[in-house]
């Protein structure tokens, strides 16, 4: 047999070469802040769809979470989210950050390269960079 077959350094190099490129990227992920304003008794988040594209989640799924956390009704209309009630930027941004922590960032490596997949009756947050899977509860 070839002695390189069991050589530790050769095995390590081979294993590292098979890892996806995302593992080696050290790019800082930043969620854009909500651009919101109050109009009458409603709050509008102007860049809601843009935020959902950055975090790579469906706007309806993301909106459902924000609405539940704020305890209000609302709807996605075009590129914005309309909330019933008056909410400040701080509270909206804190709910967005909480969503990102629970449903976007990998619990193992902290990267945002994740997908929500379903296996059987259980939904998982699967990291495409490191391969970790975490069970999550849907909204």
From Swiss-Prot:
Keywords: Initiation factor, Protein biosynthesis. It comes from the Archaea. InterPro entries: IF2/IF5 (IPR045196), TIF2_bsu_arc (IPR004458), Transl_init_fac_IF2/IF5_dom (IPR002735), Transl_init_fac_IF2/IF5_N (IPR016189), Transl_init_fac_IF2/IF5_Zn-bd (IPR016190). Pfam families: eIF-5_eIF-2B. One of its GO terms (molecular function) is translation initiation factor activity. SUPFAM superfamilies: Translation initiation factor 2 beta, aIF2beta, N-terminal domain (SSF100966), Zinc-binding domain of translation initiation factor 2 beta (SSF75689). Belongs to the eIF-2-beta/eIF-5 family. eIF-2 functions in the early steps of protein synthesis by forming a ternary complex with GTP and initiator tRNA. Heterotrimer composed of an alpha, a beta and a gamma chain. This is Translation initiation factor 2 subunit beta. It comes from Methanococcus aeolicus (strain ATCC BAA-1280 / DSM 17508 / OCM 812 / Nankai-3).
């Amino acid at each position: 047999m070839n002695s390189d077959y069991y050589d530790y350094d050769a095995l390590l190099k081979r294993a590292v070469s098979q890892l996806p490129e995302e593992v080696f990227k050290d790019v800082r992920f930043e969620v854009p802040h909500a651009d919101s304003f109050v109009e009458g008794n409603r709050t509008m988040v102007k860049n809601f769809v843009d935020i959902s594209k950055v975090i790579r989640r469906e706007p309806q799924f993301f909106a459902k979470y924000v609405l539940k956390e704020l305890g209000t009704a609302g709807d996605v209309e075009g590129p914005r989210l309309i909330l019933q009630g008056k909410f400040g930027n701080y509270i909206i941004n804190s709910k967005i950050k909480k969503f990102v922590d629970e449903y976007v960032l990998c619990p193992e490596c902290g990267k945002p390269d994740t997908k929500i997949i379903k296996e059987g009756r259980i939904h998982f947050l699967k990291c495409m960079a490191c391969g970790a899977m975490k069970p999550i509860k849907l909204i």
